[in-house]
Amino acid sequence: MANEFRVCDDCKAPNLKTLIPRLKKLDPNATIKIGCQSYCGPGRKKTFAFVNNRPVSALTEDELIEKIAERLKKS
């Protein structure tokens, strides 16, 4: 089953210009959906992405990528 990443283009925390290429590097075959994820409260304070319908957040993009990589290893 292919992985799915969902990221928000409304929230201020995620920088899509840098985050999306890094997500593609983690899994080139994953589907990436961009749009509101209704995760506004945490999304204003932390960078986040949904990985296979589960939220993953961190204070920095580097930490987020590490957490996502760990999540993908567990799947």
From Swiss-Prot:
State the InterPro entries in the record. Answer: DUF1450 (IPR009910), UPF0741 (IPR020880)
Check the record and name the Pfam families matching this protein.
DUF1450
User: In which domain of life is the source organism classified?
Assistant: Bacteria
* Similarity comment text for this entry: Belongs to the UPF0741 family.
Q: Which HAMAP family match?
A: UPF0741
Protein name per its UniProtKB record: UPF0741 protein GWCH70_3359
